[in-house]
Amino acid sequence: MSFTANLDRIVARAEELRASLSEGLNGDSFAAASRELAELEPVVARIEELWAAERGLAEAEAMLADPDMRELAESEAEILREKLPSLTREIRIALLPKDEADERSAILEIRPAAGGDEASLFAAQLFSMYQRYAEIRGWRFEILEYDDTGLGGLKGGMAEITGRSVFARLKYESGVHRVQRVPATESQGRIHTSTVTVAVLPEAEDVDVQVDEGDLRIDVYRASGAGGQHVNKTESAVRITHLPSGIVVAMQEEKSQHKNRAKAMKILKARLYEQQRAALHASRAADRRAQVGTGDRSERIRTYNFPQGRVSDHRINLTLYKIDRVMLGELDDFVDALTAEDQAARLSAQEL
């Protein structure tokens, strides 16, 4: 279908939905039509703006033959010629296939990789950075796991981030994050390099993943704290093993075994859902390990250089000299640039 024909189809569909809603629909049909129309209306507004610009350009060009109107017509035509390509591009981007998971909430997982104690300290800082970003965006941030080192570091942490388009905004954060700085314990002033892995998984819904209880091995045990000492006299900690996939999820944050099991199942479903998505979309990692890499220092998506006060995203060659603001959760500059880069790449691929 040509671009022009596709625009006609979209506008016609929006008119059809408006007519159906005005005539009255019941229950699920009304809700479905309302959702579809809400998605189409911003695109239709841009299409109508494009058509108005095209009509205006045609009228201005027709006026060029009139000596009295030529100067005004040339000025108007120039403005509209400059406007048309950007409008067309905006519409093409809006019509790109959407990731079904973009509107969903997400599971965030952070683990120190290379660098020992310094990696653990930076993992804790990244966890706080994303928590602050969630606050800025108005999202709910619930800690599912926070295994601290006892020295301000983080052995591993997970959080459920709930809100609209959480996955769409955070999915580009998956990968290896590298930090370069002088540790507090470094007497010679040498810069150390450490890495932390970040994984962002779209939250699974019950319709996405069906888990057979017979495929699960569930172990319960007493929760332990820093240093390995038991902090709970009851067996409240839960470890769930999904036998077909080999995925293991352990949870001990809650004092209730029931709550720990519910959280562990939520994480398990998110990981199974991501595996399904990976199988369906060859461009994505085959599993979570591929998503975050090995944690080796040479594999990185972003570098945080504290001595220079800069943060560099290596995928889009964007460097910002405001590391303090970034660590306080001001990530939108990176997220917006990564989103634009992804849209441009998909648009180019579509036009080939």
Curated annotation (Swiss-Prot):
<feature type="modified residue" description="N5-methylglutamine">
    <location>
        <position position="229"/>
    </location>
</feature>
<keyword id="KW-0648">Protein biosynthesis</keyword>
<comment type="function">
    <text>Peptide chain release factor 1 directs the termination of translation in response to the peptide chain termination codons UAG and UAA.</text>
</comment>
<keyword id="KW-0963">Cytoplasm</keyword>
<dbReference type="GO" id="GO:0016149">
    <property type="term" value="F:translation release factor activity, codon specific"/>
</dbReference>
<dbReference type="GO" id="GO:0005737">
    <property type="term" value="C:cytoplasm"/>
</dbReference>
<protein>
    <recommendedName>
        <fullName>Peptide chain release factor 1</fullName>
    </recommendedName>
</protein>
<dbReference type="InterPro" id="IPR004373">
    <property type="entry name" value="RF-1"/>
</dbReference>
<dbReference type="InterPro" id="IPR050057">
    <property type="entry name" value="Prokaryotic/Mito_RF"/>
</dbReference>
<dbReference type="Pfam" id="PF00472">
    <property type="entry name" value="RF-1"/>
</dbReference>
<dbReference type="InterPro" id="IPR045853">
    <property type="entry name" value="Pep_chain_release_fac_I_sf"/>
</dbReference>
<comment type="similarity">
    <text>Belongs to the prokaryotic/mitochondrial release factor family.</text>
</comment>
<dbReference type="Pfam" id="PF03462">
    <property type="entry name" value="PCRF"/>
</dbReference>
<keyword id="KW-0488">Methylation</keyword>
<dbReference type="InterPro" id="IPR005139">
    <property type="entry name" value="PCRF"/>
</dbReference>
<dbReference type="InterPro" id="IPR000352">
    <property type="entry name" value="Pep_chain_release_fac_I"/>
</dbReference>
